[in-house]
Amino acid sequence: QRQMCIRDREVGGRPEAAAPVQAWNTEVPVERTLESDVTASDSRLLAVPANGRLSTEYFRTALFIGDSLSQGFALYAPTRDVATVCAYKSTSPNQVLQNFVGQRPDGSRIEMWDDIKVQSPSNIYVLYGTNALISQSDEAFLKYYSDLLDKLRERFAGVPIYVQSITPTTAEQGVKQPPLENGHIRLINNAIAKLAVSKGLYYLDAQEALADADGNLRGDYVGTYDGIHMNPTGYAAWADYILTHTVYSDYNKQFVTEGPYA
């Protein structure tokens, strides 16, 4: 029997596609037409705004796709044993496209795209970049990321896809590895935001929840020596940000606990 993503249970009931007008720092009902013409240069202007709050039950039908940063959603509350996590250590989009074997949070190994494509989520969260920025050019990373997002759109037609910002690192890590310096990460996030919205996907500015006033990973969220990965407190803050930055839909309405749709 083949191994699958770490999950709580099989899910279904995909909602109809929806796409909002996205505005920075504004809590309002959001709508947007697909395939938008994107001209904003600041990713915050393209991000999903605050929009009430959903309960953690929302995560039972969510799928997280990414690298070891996304693996934390399988390890820590409130998403552990709730969300489905298809995240693989030291992974970049080109490896997923080529169906390389990846290492899951529990240490087992599986062909990555084969693992992802059999899922039936109601919402998808995608995050790549930390490994790719170190191992390849920015242009190559963005091209492969674009191709992967197209592949996800085709496979999961009608399912809302949230493309998350690359998360901040510590200032010290940025000195050690210049591609992961937060000023550079912000530039790449601007490109990712444009890419996502131009494809009719949603852009989630996780930096807003995880960065300090200087744009570095908050000290109380740092979880490992590498200045990249986070502790349970950081993941709890990240998950809370997701629950307060979702797009309204008839499907999501069942999880609303406060806000304009409560």
PLM features per residue range, with description:
Residues 14-61:
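N-terminal low-complexity, Pro/Thr/Ser-rich intrinsically disordered segments
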Residues 59-61, 119-124, 156-161, 199-202:
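Loop/turn elements at helix/coil->beta-strand transitions in domains of secreted/extracellular proteins
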Residues 169-262:
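Catalytic His-Asp segment of secreted/periplasmic serine-dependent ester chemistry enzymes
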Residues 74, 129, 146, 150-157, ...:
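Sec-exported extracytoplasmic/periplasmic mature domains
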Residues 52-143:
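Conserved SGNH/GDSL esterase-like catalytic core that processes O-acyl groups on lipids
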